[in-house]
């Protein structure tokens, strides 16, 4: 497994990267820990970090507008993050039109990717490269909602201890918004299971 998935890459935040999926929780943690460099520690993010990221997006979104509009903008962004993330993420029920020339999409579970342009006019499960549309990037944080579930280090429940966050392109954005938390076991992997890591010194 590890010879096929080297962990010597430098971590970057950029558009048009392929989602790293089909990874079990423990594999994701091993990969995340190996993506450190220059004294930086790396790991899967903790649940509290996920929640603080959502709060950061909320506060920065509100800060960016004039005082008269702040209450409405706060209501809207909280709804988008907590109740219905359809319009800010790649979900089954989000009908989008990808116009970024370097973005790619997959209609066969990530086996092959095709170069956009692509317009989704019916509900369908389409996997995208990162940041494929500007609406999926909130404060330069890509795909916090939809596309693939992301493993975190938080505990979920006794039967399904490993938490996944944020929903996926196979689900509905109103049922699995960015704040959503589900549980799985360490043995599970899948097309819509990926991970997000944190870096700190």
Predicted segments — roles?
Residues 143-144, 192:
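Residue-level recognition of short, solvent-exposed, well-ordered loop/turn junctions
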Residues 19-26, 30-33, 45, 128-136, ...:
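Disulfide-stabilized, aromatic/cysteine-rich ligand-recognition loop
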Residues 59, 154-157:
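Short, well-ordered loop/turn and helix-capping segments at boundaries between secondary-structure elements
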Residues 146-154:
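Active-site-proximal beta-strands of protease catalytic cores
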Residues 1, 47, 150, 194-196:
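Residue-level signal for functionally critical sites in structured catalytic/ligand-binding pockets
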Residues 1-143, 201:
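Short aromatic-cysteine micro-motif
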């Amino acid at each position: 497994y590890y010879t096929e998935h080297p962990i010597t890459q430098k971590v970057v935040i950029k558009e048009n990267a392929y989602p790293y999926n089909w990874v079990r929780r423990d594999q994701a943690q091993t990969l995340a820990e190996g993506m450190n460099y220059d004294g930086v520690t790396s790991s899967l993010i903790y649940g509290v970090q996920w929640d603080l990221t959502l709060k950061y997006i909320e506060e920065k979104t509100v800060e960016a507008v004039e005082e008269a509009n702040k209450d409405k903008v706060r209501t809207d962004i909280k709804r988008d993050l907590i109740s219905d993330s359809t319009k800010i993420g790649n979900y089954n029920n989000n009908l989008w039109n990808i116009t970024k020339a370097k973005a790619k999409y997959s209609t066969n579970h990530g086996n092959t990717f095709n170069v956009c342009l692509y317009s989704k006019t019916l509900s369908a499960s389409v996997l995208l490269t990162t940041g494929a549309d500007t609406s999926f990037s909130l404060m330069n944080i890509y795909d916090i909602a939809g596309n693939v579930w992301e493993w975190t280090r938080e505990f979920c429940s006794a039967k399904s201890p490993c938490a996944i966050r944020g929903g996926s392109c196979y689900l509905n954005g109103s049922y699995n918004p960015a704040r959503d938390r589900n549980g799985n076991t360490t043995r599970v992997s899948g097309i819509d299971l990926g991970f997000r890591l944190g870096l700190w010194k």
